[in-house]
Amino acid sequence: MVASHRLLTLMVFALLTIPMISGLISDKCTEGCKSTIGCNTRCMMRGGGYCESAKIHGAVKIFCCCNNYSNSPISSPVIN
């Protein structure tokens, strides 16, 4: 039972870190989110943003992550 729990924990860890290693998370997230309002302002043209915490090398770091919505009303051209 303990071995299967450890295996499951390892699999979840791998699934969470693979996108970060490959650059999928780091492309839309930057380190140093001080407030959600500031992150939303920085990511306004991408559909807003949010603060996300992640544990990297044993330390918890907070990132500002942009939504990257391609159909955001702010970033989409107006069609009349």
Swiss-Prot record:
GO terms, biological process: defense response to fungus; killing of cells of another organism
Keyword check for Zinc: no
Highest taxon above the source species: Eukaryota
Annotated localization: Secreted
Location (main, coarse): secreted
Cystine connections: 29-66, 33-51, 39-64, 43-65
GO cellular component: extracellular region
Region forming the signal peptide: 1-23
Keywords (A to Z) from UniProt: Antimicrobial, Disulfide bond, Fungicide, Plant defense, Secreted, Signal
Secreted found in the keyword field: yes
Sequence similarity: Belongs to the DEFL family.
Name this protein carries in UniProt: Defensin-like protein 85
